[in-house]
Curated annotation (Swiss-Prot):
HAMAP family (UniProt xref): Maf (MF_00528)
Gene Ontology CC: cytoplasm
Record-stated family: Belongs to the Maf family.
Coiled-coil ranges per UniProt: none
Its EC number(s): 3.6.1.9
This protein's name: Nucleoside triphosphate pyrophosphatase
GO BP term, example: nucleotide metabolic process
Organism in which the protein naturally occurs: Hyphomonas neptunium (strain ATCC 15444)
Entry-linked InterPro entries: ITPase-like_fam, Maf-like
Main location: cytoplasm
Cofactor(s) for this UniProt protein: a divalent metal cation
Length: 198
């Protein structure tokens, strides 16, 4: 019998990535106060990549304490230098994100942790680097207006799988990690655990 797989998230995009790759996983909300946890980590001056990893672990542990099998927790944070970006609260904040990122390179700290029986057993951190072209104010206004509230669900106020591709001059790292799930290393681990065929 194969191990059950649960995604400690209600993220439609992460579930869709897993399903498209042939991984059946239930999505369960981890019920974590992410904002409070992030504020504590930032007050302690943890590097952005460590913040993402700890939040991914917390999500997986919370759900794993109540669910059998393997529980996948994930988190993605955008780092511009040492500064962490959160999902924009509204469209004006999305515009400000884009203004700050314009003409610069940033990293998407994309962490996943797998827990079993309430304890972490596997971790992976992907760090795709994206370079945004210089954006004009007119472009930012038009882009945000046309994409609308969809931009509020991403840390960078862009969706690479759509018109957000127009924002970049260079991308280093794998596509799945940019979308929020380092899928290839995850699939490797699931094969090791015999969740997927080898």
């Amino acid at each position: 019998m194969s191990l059950a797989v649960t995604l400690a998230s209600t993220s439609k995009s992460r579930r869709a990535l897993l399903a498209a790759a042939g991984v059946e996983a239930d999505g369960v909300a981890p019920n974590v106060d992410e904002e409070s946890f992030r504020n504590t980590m930032r007050a302690n001056k943890l590097p952005v990549r460590e913040q993402a990893m700890q939040l991914a672990e917390l999500k997986a542990m919370r759900v794993s304490a109540k669910r059998p099998g393997l529980v996948i927790g994930g988190d993605q944070m955008l780092a511009l230098g040492d500064e962490a970006f959160d999902k924009p609260a509204d469209l004006e904040a999305a515009k400000n994100h884009l203004r700050q990122l314009s003409g610069k390179s940033h990293t998407l700290e994309t962490a996943i942790v797998i827990c079993e029986d309430g304890a972490p057993i596997w971790r992976h951190l992907a760090r795709p680097k994206l370079t945004m072209r210089p954006l004009t104010e007119d472009f930012i206004e038009t882009y945000v207006s046309s994409c609308g509230d969809a931009l509020l669900s991403t840390v960078g106020a862009y969706q690479l799988e759509g018109p957000g591709a127009q924002l970049f001059t260079r991308i280093e790292g794998d596509y799945f990690s940019i979308l929020g799930l380092p899928l290839l290393p995850l699939l490797d681990y699931l094969r090791i655990r015999k969740v997927l065929p080898t």
